[in-house]
Amino acid sequence: MATQIARYVAPGNNLPGWHSAEQAWAQTQAQLAWYKAMEDAGEMIMIKDKEGLDKHVAQWMNNVPAEKKPVGFILSLEGADSLISLQHLEIAYEYGLRAVGPAHYGPGRYVNGTDASGKMNSNGLALLKKMEELNIALDATHLCDDAFWQAMDYFKGNVWASHNNCRALVNHNRQFSDNKKKKLI
């Protein structure tokens, strides 16, 4: 996985981030430009579908030394705050985005994340619906507990958690309870 991340925070919020979705979008586009530069240099290759994955795996099975092979990646967005509108999700899909984690830390434009609570707002539900239509996977990693359960009931596409620990081992709302892990499995 390769990540784009640029969070929006309302003015006056102490969390780090951009004060407009447009600024956050621009930051993700700069990150995308870096990934494209790495592709142009032959260092990386974006995997957008099963055909691309199969081709990449076959390339890694040949006898060329590993240091001469590009690293394959699936593009993910951590925190959807940079998506100015659902049209921007469509644009991102066209350039290769295949997974979205709608939340990050605190309150978000679509859903609340770590150290926050509350269900998804109407924009968050519309985001999930559009992700389903585009076959974009849902990364449930930073969803607050309320939003996690709501998303699991609402979203019918592929779901995963990219980077979590067990709440039984690390007692913090950022981590997944046993019930949340069971729901994913």
Predicted segment positions?
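Active-site core of metal-dependent hydrolases
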Residues: 102-183
